[in-house]
């Protein structure tokens, strides 16, 4: 690890330049919140001068150590339906990535990450990890969303299989840190938001001709069972103003075909699509209301981006979702899974545009605490803690 001195306004700062190994099975996708956060972190670390090496699947590139993925069997097949892959750990490739590394950060509790951690420890390289996967992601996609016993078992199992070997866990929300405490995860927990990139801010964007005169409601996220876009579709049909509502669902996923069929009863066809980051900025600034209906969420980058652009959110008050932490008052919360209650909230905001305008300003102000650069600094702080603790052993 080298030390670089930076001089700003006659003040000298020391920047520790690190070789950081990031481990994540999936990196190329932009339809997955965890992958998006990983990509943004890598870019930010490189901009700060760090050398970042990626152990992942996907296409070759600078400082990328590409591994094949499991293709056969039930688990890889089910994972692929949900946009996930599992890498095959190949020791020779992993060893090359670890040469001279200062720190390893693993994203998921999967076989690849576990093997990298084992090899890093053998070489004396400190490791940190993250908790982006909730047990309910497993139970929902297994068709057992109401089985709390199974959810508890999953948390205990991944603790024994993976997390017990780490001393530092990044939690994207206090909710996730509390969940780990509840299931007796002993590692030090760093509550660090994934952060809001500076590109997401208010700007004047006129509605395209086909949307003019309509009340546009947006939800961004994978079209999967736990995201509950079905509740939003039903709520739009129950609204007093259904004929004036244009629903936009941004994302892909296993429930896409089902939601196309479900939305056929709406007066205005739902707009389904996948959008680039720059297009999302325009979309957030063009729409009238943001809804986050998910039952399961460790943070929700899209909701943060929406209110940073001034789009007032209406969020499901699910007990297993962290997103409700962003609600500034009860007008931004609805009963999770309750389409009628969501419809009532939608109607309220259609009928109270001046209140929405005032609340929009407050949401923009509240977004400052999730400044992306500050969040990256906190991640670097966690890495430095792990390195310092290892040096003191």
Regions found by a protein language model. Name each.
Residues 58, 175, 195:
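Carbohydrate-associated surface elements
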Residues 98, 274-275, 282-287:
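Short alpha-helical donor nucleotide-sugar binding micro-motif in glycosyltransferases
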Residues 109, 295:
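Aromatic "clamp/platform" in nucleotide-sugar-dependent glycosyltransferases that forms part
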Residues 122, 150-168, 183:
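Membrane-proximal helix-turn-helix segments that form the acceptor-binding/catalytic region
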Residues 209-237, 248:
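Conserved donor-binding/catalytic core segment of Leloir-type glycosyltransferases
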Residues 257-278:
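Nucleotide-activated donor-binding/catalytic signature segment of Leloir-type glycosyltransferases, i.e.
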Residues 318, 328-339, 348-353:
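Conserved acidic donor-binding segment of nucleotide-sugar-dependent glycosyltransferases
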């Amino acid at each position: 690890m080298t030390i670089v001195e930076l001089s700003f306004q006659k003040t000298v700062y020391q920047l520790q330049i690190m070789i950081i190994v990031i481990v994540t099975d999936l990196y190329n996708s932009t339809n997955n919140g965890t992958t998006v956060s990983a990509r943004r972190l890598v870019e930010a670390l490189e901009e700060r001068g760090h050398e970042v090496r990626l152990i992942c699947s996907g296409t070759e590139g600078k400082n990328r150590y590409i591994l094949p993925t499991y293709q056969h069997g039930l688990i890889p097949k089910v994972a692929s339906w949900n946009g996930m892959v599992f890498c095959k750990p190949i020791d020779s490739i992993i060893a090359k990535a670890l040469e001279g590394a200062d720190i390893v950060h693993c994203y998921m509790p999967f076989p690849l990450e576990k093997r990298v951690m084992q090899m890093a420890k053998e070489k004396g390289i400190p490791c940190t990890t993250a908790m982006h996967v909730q047990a309910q992601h497993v139970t929902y996609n297994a068709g057992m969303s109401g089985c709390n016993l199974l959810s508890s078992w999953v948390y205990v199992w991944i603790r024994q299989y993976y997390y017990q070997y780490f001393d530092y866990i990044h939690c994207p929300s206090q909710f996730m840190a509390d969940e780990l405490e509840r299931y007796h995860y002993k590692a030090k927990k760093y509550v660090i938001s994934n952060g809001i990139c500076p590109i997401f801010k208010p700007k004047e964007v006129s509605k395209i001709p086909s949307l003019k005169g309509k009340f546009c409601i947006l939800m961004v996220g994978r079209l999967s069972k736990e995201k509950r876009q079905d509740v939003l579709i039903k709520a739009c049909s129950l609204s007093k103003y259904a004929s004036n509502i244009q629903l936009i669902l941004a994302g892909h996923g296993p429930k896409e075909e089902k939601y196309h069929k479900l939305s056929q009863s709406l007066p205005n066809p739902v707009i389904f699509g996948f959008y680039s980051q720059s297009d999302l900025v325009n979309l957030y600034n063009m729409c009238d209301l943001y809804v986050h209906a998910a039952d399961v969420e460790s943070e929700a980058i899209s909701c943060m981006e929406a209110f940073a652009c001034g789009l007032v959110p209406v969020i499901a008050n699910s007990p297993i979702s962290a997103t409700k932490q962003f609600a500034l008052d009860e007008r931004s919360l609805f009963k999770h899974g309750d389409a009628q209650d969501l419809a009532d909230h939608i109607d309220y905001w259609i009928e109270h545009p001046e209140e929405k305008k005032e609340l929009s300003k407050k949401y923009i102000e509240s977004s400052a605490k999730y400044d992306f650069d500050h969040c990256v600094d906190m991640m670097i702080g966690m890495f430095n803690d792990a390195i310092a603790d290892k040096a003191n052993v």
